[in-house]
Amino acid sequence: MADVTAKMVKELRDMTGVGMMDAKKALVKVEGDMEKAVDFLRENGMAKAAKKNDRIAAEGLANVATVGNVAAIVEVNSETDFVSKNEMFQDLVKDIATKVAENKPATMEEAMAIKTEKGTIESDLIEATTVIGEKISFRRFEVVEKADNAAFGAYLHMGGRIAVLTVIDGTTDEEVAKDVAMHIAAINPRYVNESQIPQEELEHEKAVLTEQALNEGKPANIVEKMVVGRLQKFKAEIALVDQPFVKDPDMTVEKFVASKGGEVKSFVRFEVGEGIEKREDNFADEVMSQMKN
C-alpha cells in the first residue's frame, strides 16, 4: 500500500474542495493515485448527491450573461442563503449563464446536457452538491435574442437575489437598458405595456373595483366613472412603460426610453426562490433555538 502524505491530501483537497478526511480516505482507497482519487470522489459524490434530492432548494443566485446578440438569465438554487456567498457556487452560476447563452438550449434537458470544462452542466451541479454539502439545482432559464440596433440591459440586485434582463429596441445604449432593468428589479412590473394584460385579469379587477365602489355607497352613474379611473390606475401599476421612472418620477419609463431613441421590447425578472414553498419546520427550529438562548 502506497504511503499517503499530508502534501498529497492537501493537493487533492485543493483540486476537489473536499474535506481532509474524505481526501485521505480516497487516496488510501486507490493507493495514492491522484487521478483515481479524483474519480473516486466524483463517483461517490454522485451517489451522495442522489440522496439529497428530497431537500428543498429555495435560496441561491440568479445571473445574466450576454454573448453577442444572445443573452441568458438563469436561476440556480441552494438550500441556505449562506451558500450564495460561496465562491465556487458563484462561479458555477456565472458559468451556467454563459454556457446557456452560448448554446441557446430550448429545454432544461438540453441545458443540462451542455458540455462544460469538467463534463456537463448536470455533472457540474452534482459535483457542486457534493463539495458544498447542499443540494444545488438549476431551476430555470430563459434565452433572449436581440437585433443589431437594440441593447441588452442586465441588472443584479443584492448580488443576484434578483436578476433582470431587458431588451430595448432602437438604441444600442446599454446604460439606458440597464437603468430600465434596475427599475424592473425595484418595482416588479408584470407586463411591458397594457396590451399584454390578459382580458380575464382586467375583467376580474373590474368586478372587484365595481364591488368596492358600490360598497362605498356611490350611485351607479358615479360607480362606472370611478371604476374606469381605478382600472386605468391598476393597469399603470402593473405595466412597465406607464410607471413613473425610479430615477426620475416626473417621467414614465416609456418617456425616459423614448428620450434616448428607444422602445422597451421585453424583460425577464427572476427573483430567487419565488414560487418555491419552503419548509416551515426549518423556521420553527430556528425560533425554538433562539428562545433557548
From Swiss-Prot:
PROSITE patterns: EF_TS_1, EF_TS_2. Its main location: cytoplasm. The keyword Hydrolase does not apply. The keyword Protein biosynthesis applies. Keywords: Cytoplasm, Elongation factor, Protein biosynthesis. GO terms for molecular function: translation elongation factor activity. Residues 80-83 are annotated as: Involved in Mg(2+) ion dislocation from EF-Tu. One of its GO terms (cellular component) is cytoplasm. It is found in: Cytoplasm. InterPro entries: EF-Ts_dimer_sf, Transl_elong_EFTs/EF1B, Transl_elong_EFTs/EF1B_dimer, Transl_elong_Ts_CS, UBA-like_sf. SUPFAM superfamilies: Elongation factor Ts (EF-Ts), dimerisation domain, UBA-like. Associates with the EF-Tu.GDP complex and induces the exchange of GDP to GTP. It remains bound to the aminoacyl-tRNA.EF-Tu.GTP complex up to the GTP hydrolysis stage on the ribosome. Belongs to the EF-Ts family. PANTHER family: ELONGATION FACTOR TS, ELONGATION FACTOR TS, MITOCHONDRIAL. This is Elongation factor Ts.
